[in-house]
Structures are given as C-alpha cells and as structure tokens.
Regions:
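Active-site neighborhoods of enzymes that stabilize oxyanions during catalysis
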Residues: 58, 131, 139
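Active-site-proximal alpha/beta segments of enzymes that process anionic O-linked groups
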Residues: 1-73, 169-170, 175-200
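Flexible internal linker/loop segments at domain or repeat junctions
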Residues: 68-81, 149-158
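Membrane-interface soluble catalytic domains
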Residues: 102-107, 123, 130-132, 147-224
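Short, solvent-exposed loop/turn segments at the edges of secondary structure
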Residues: 21, 136-138
Length: 224
C-alpha cells in the first residue's frame, strides 16, 4: 500500500490523515504541484498487488498558486472568467487525473480507479462550517473498472450505472471503496455502498454536514 500526498504532513488539519497514511507500507510527502504525481508513480518499486492512495492539493486557496506558471495560459480558461483562478485549478487537475489514469493503465495494470473530493468551494466563503453553503459540499466523483475487473465482479458496474443519477456524498466513501475493492469489514454497510444493489441513499434521506443538512434542501436540486 502506498500513500502519495501533496498536503502538509505535520499540520493540525492533516493530523488524522497523516496517522492513516503512516500505516501504509510506504508514504510519499511531496512539496510540489499535483502533476508531480506521475514522477512519484514512476519511482514505485514493482509489486504484484498494490493499492495507491493519492491525496492531491487540488483547488485550495490561493488557487493560482496550485497551477504551474508555464501552464496557466494553456488550459483553456478565459481571462474574462469571473472565477478564473479557481477554474484554472479545475482544468489543471482534470489534466492531472487524465495523466494518472493513462499512466496507470499503461504501466501499473490498473484494475480500478476511484476519485472524489473531500469538499467543494464557495467563491466567497471558501469551505467552512459557518456560514454553510451547499456548493461547499458539491464534489466530483468517478469510478473506473477495467474490463477484467468487471468480469471478475460482474455485479459492480450494473449497480454503479443504476445509481448514476442518485445522491452520493463522501460520507459514503468507506463503504463504497471497500465494496468496490472487495475489502468488506465488520463495519461495512451495503446500504451506504454506491456499488451495491442494496444502496439506499436517496433525495429523501441523504444528509451532509454531520447530518445537520438535508441534500434535498440544496438550491441546485430545487432548481433555484
């Protein structure tokens, strides 16, 4: 198991994540742009089986500082975009994810890839507990399963596709990831696993922010 992180290893906000990371076989703490992930992947020693966790820096403020200077004018983001700096980080990390995916498929015998954010962002208040805005919990989420992994676990892809339009929050990451990877524990609950036919989260019962906020109250879902 390998952990690759572009966050501060010793900050208070990263303490919990650091404790988990240090339990991996190897951990790599990088002070570089997210695109450097490829260089770290290329240095990993050969292994028959491997799980790699990658904790990229993403779209944290100050946004412009997250993107290499030589790429800032090459990512297709208009200078007239009112959220130029933030959107630049999105475009940059889209490219980073593409590069990681293509490298892993070509060189690491990629069986599955799961990506999600820990939070979204409000352009005025960033991400915080007070005040709370729903765009702070809008996150990207995607799952890739290789053809042979799908063949070995034929129940996964139909379940994932059937839930494509349903609610997912990263509170459900534990059950979903362990379900996809067939690493279920005594704590696993299939009703919270997005890849299970038993998935039971919907607009009526989905919550976020320590169950204090109902997803159905999000203005996006209400068409506002």
């Amino acid at each position: 198991t390998d952990w690759i992180s572009f966050h501060n290893r010793s900050s208070m906000s990263s303490a919990g994540v650091t404790m988990i990371a240090e339990r991996c076989d190897d951990s790599y703490w990088e002070k570089n742009y997210d695109g450097y992930t490829l260089e770290v992947l290329k240095k990993l020693p050969p292994a028959k089986k491997r799980i790699i966790f990658i904790n990229i820096d993403g779209s944290h403020y100050t946004y412009i500082a997250r993107v290499p200077v030589n790429l800032r004018d090459k990512l297709g983001i208009s200078k007239e975009d009112p959220y130029h700096d933030y959107d630049l980080t999105i475009a940059y990390d889209d490219q980073v994810m593409k590069d990681i995916f293509e490298y892993a498929k070509a060189n690491l015998n990629l069986k599955s890839m799961i990506y999600f954010s820990d939070h979204g962002e409000n352009m005025k208040h960033y991400h915080t507990t007070s005040p709370f805005y729903y765009d702070m919990v809008h996150i990207p989420f995607f799952v890739y399963l290789s053809p042979d992994y799908q063949a070995a676990h034929p129940e996964l892809m139909p379940a994932l596709k059937s839930h494509e339009q349903q609610v997912f929050t990263n509170d459900l990451a534990f059950d979903t990831v362990t379900g996809i990877w067939q690493a279920k524990t005594n704590f696993y609950q299939s009703q919270y696993d997005f890849s299970s036919k038993d998935y039971a989260i919907n607009m009526d019962n989905a919550t976020t922010f320590e169950r204090k906020k109902k997803i159905k109250d999000d203005p996006v879902w209400q068409g506002k």
